[in-house]
C-alpha cells in the first residue's frame, strides 16, 4: 500500500493548487481512503451512472463463473439456516462470511456510481462459502445432492462451450490453424474428464476447473486480442511507435477522452483549439471524423494520415458483437500530419 500512498501524496499533497472535481488543497490519503469511496456512494463529484439496484447481482452471475449456481445455492442454504435458527448463537456455525457478503452487497448496490470491479471484495468470501458448502455436502455423503450440483456444473460447461464456439466462429472468426490445434486438444481433454468415471464431488471440481480453463483460454487468447483491434487509441499507439512519431508533438482539438492513446504513449495528448493550431508547424493531430471535418472547413490540409477502427470496448453491445451489424457502431480515429 506504500507505493499507492506515495503516488497520491505526489498527486495531491504536493500540488494543493490543483483543482480536482471542484476542490483544491486535497490530501491524497484522505481522498483514497475516505472521499472517493463516499463520493461513489452518493454520486457527488464523480457522477451517477446506474440506478439499477440489481446491477451487482446480474454482474455476479458472470463474474463468478463457473461456480455461480453452486455459489448462490451455498448462500441461500447458509442464509436460510441462519433465519431458521432465529439468529441464535451457534459455536459450530460461522456467519462472518455470510454477513460480509450481505453487508457489502447492500452497501455497493445503493452506490450511485457502480462498476463491476466493486465485486472483487466479495469474490473471496463467496469462494470460501462455496468451498465450505461443497465440502459439507461431500461429508454428508448425500449422492443425490451431489448429482444435482454436478448437473448444474455440466449446464455451466455447456453454456461456456456454446459461447466459446460463437466467439471463435461468429463474433471474431478465427482463421489461425494452430489455434484450432490447442482448442481441439483442450476439448478432447474436457471430453475425457466428462466421460471418466469419478466420484461426484471430485467431478464437480474437475468440471468447474475445466470450464474456467476453457473460458479464460478463449477470452485471453482470442476474444480480447481481437476486441483490442477496435480500441483506436491502443492501435494508433502501435502506429505511432512503428513510424517513430514524437509523442510530445501530438494534439487534439476536442475534449474527447484519449485514455488508451495516453497510456500506451506514456504521455497525454495535448489539448488545443483550431485557432491555436494556425501558429504551429510540423504537428500531428489525433481526431475523429467530426474533428477532421472541422479542420478541413478551417482551411487545414495534411500530407499524411493514419486511420484506426474505434469502438468503446468496455461498452459491448449486440450490434457490435454481430459482425453483420458491426460497421453500424464502429467509428474511426485518425492521426494526421499538418506540415
Model regions and ranges:
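Hydrophobic core segments of alpha-helical transmembrane domains in multi-pass membrane proteins
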Residues: 120-125, 179-188
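Transmembrane alpha-helical segments
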Residues: 157-176, 186-198, 204-227
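Transmembrane-lumen/periplasm boundary regions of multi-pass, lipid-linked membrane glycan transferases
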Residues: 1-91, 97-117, 122-136, 141, ...
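Transmembrane helix-loop-helix
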Residues: 174-181, 300
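Short periplasmic/luminal acceptor-recognition loop of GT-C membrane glycosyltransferases, typified by
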Residues: 207-332
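Extended hydrophobic-aromatic, low-complexity segments
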Residues: 117-119, 130-131, 137, 177-179, ...
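A cytosolic-side transmembrane-helix exit/cap motif
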Residues: 137-148, 199-202, 224-232
